[in-house]
Amino acid sequence: MKIKHMPAKKSRLSKAQRDFLDTYFEVNPHPNTQERAYIASQSLVSEEKIRNWFQNRRTRERGDCKIASHRSAFSVNTFEENTSSVHPTSNDLYIRR
């Protein structure tokens, strides 16, 4: 009979750690190796977790930009569709018999 090992419990960052990382991300979203080592020592988080956090945050940032641009394009199209019936075009000014 094989004994299955339970995976290690995933540790979460504290609010203070997230705030520190968010602040650093605003200044530099691409920290180099030395900067990641500094961040890890200041936040008491492993360098690997810091590297992953920045990678995930950049991905999330790109995804948020795509969603925002899609929403703004959608709202402009919706606005144009809704206002076309309110404002007649030049062709609508001619009465066809």
From Swiss-Prot:
Predominant place of localization: nucleus
Protein's UniProt keywords contain DNA-binding: yes
CDD domains per UniProt: homeodomain (cd00086)
Record's protein name: Homeobox protein HD-9
DNA-binding region (UniProt annotation): 6-65
SUPFAM superfamilies on file: Homeodomain-like
Entry keyword set: DNA-binding, Homeobox, Nucleus
Intracellular or extracellular location(s): Nucleus
Gene that this polypeptide is encoded by: HD-9
The keyword DNA-binding belongs to this UniProt entry's keyword annotation: yes
Gene Ontology MF terms in the entry: DNA-binding transcription factor activity, RNA polymerase II-specific; RNA polymerase II transcription regulatory region sequence-specific DNA binding
Pfam families: Homeodomain
Species annotation: Encephalitozoon cuniculi (strain GB-M1)
InterPro entries: HD (IPR001356), Homeobox_CS (IPR017970), Homeobox_regulator (IPR051306), Homeodomain-like_sf (IPR009057)
GO CC aspect terms: nucleus
Domain of life: Eukaryota
